[in-house]
């Protein structure tokens, strides 16, 4: 039998009690009668009438006797026993011993029947409690199962909603992409329609192309072939200019790098040369090109030179600077004379020098005559900036004497020693002192 919650339940125990009351004629029977009555009242179980219920059927006890004892039956055979009948239907009442009395032995037998029935009823009640506990456990398990199924259904519903949302987003994105492609195709079609000229314009364009072709044919093949030859030549020249520019930049970087490395050694060399009397005068007089310009008074003035420095300007290709240091002498008052060559942006070379403050009566002769040629004197080189010979002196000093003056100083005694590099003649340059060292 199943209830409303779907759990199978055990039908209640159906009991029908039949209580038989007899009169107990003796004291022993009265005592048993009272005990049985108390037990029957304590163990009566009321149930709903009809099918599946437990019913108690009891006969009313006969009234007590006039003597104040236990009620007696008319025959005086004993008390009325009470007992329960299990499994009956409806209300049943069985009277026994109302008209005919029963012997006391039958009263004892009835009491035994009641006790047995009472024991069976207790077992039935305990079984019913156990059945109720089992039913409660089954109901709790069914409730937990139902709750888990509801939660799983909710999770499944949430997942379905998420998947549905993702599918909807993907479909909307695909729709947007399709719309964009459709718009792009429409725009391209419009552009193609706009680019297509009218029929009249197409005719004009074709006519212009035909006229241009006729003009090229009339000019002949020579200009075309010349253009074909000039284009590769111009391309090669552009590439060559690019390589030259890269070489210039690399050369400048190398000059800066090694210039810093040389500076340390040049400072040490200058310090040693300052302590050698007449070092630079001897080097100048032993140089094959410079010795021709040192005559008479120039040789005397060079005896007072203490040091010489050649420095390039900020950019190596923009020029250089010559510094001559002198000690006190009777010819001029300057202790430092500077000769500077600067290459301007136009490419023209400009020379500048410190004015020499001559002492009275010691102005040098500007030119000397040798083999019918006018030769610039050494000290005239400081102040005269017009003759090409002046630029030649600067080139010799910068490129030959300054890098290695020791080799010319050692020629004083005519001793040929091993040189780090051989003597070289100064190279003629196409323009005045361009300092084309690279």
UniProtKB/Swiss-Prot annotation:
Domain of life of the source: Eukaryota
InterPro entries according to UniProt: NAP-like_sf, NAP_family
Per UniProt, location of the Glycyl lysine isopeptide (Lys-Gly) (interchain with G-Cter in SUMO2) cross-link in this chain: 156
Pfam families, A to Z: NAP
GO cellular component: nucleolus
Any GO BP annotation: nucleosome assembly
Post-translational modification remark: Ubiquitinated by the CRL2(APPBP2) complex, which recognizes the Arg-Xaa-Xaa-Gly sequence at the C-terminus, leading to its degradation.
Keyword Nucleus: yes
Keywords carried by this UniProt record: Isopeptide bond, Nucleus, Ubl conjugation
Stretches for region Disordered: 41-82
Main location class: nucleus
SUPFAM superfamilies cross-referenced by the UniProt entry: NAP-like
Cellular localization per UniProt: Nucleus, Nucleolus
Similarity section: Belongs to the nucleosome assembly protein (NAP) family.
Protein name as annotated: Testis-specific Y-encoded-like protein 1
Organism: Pongo abelii (Sumatran orangutan)
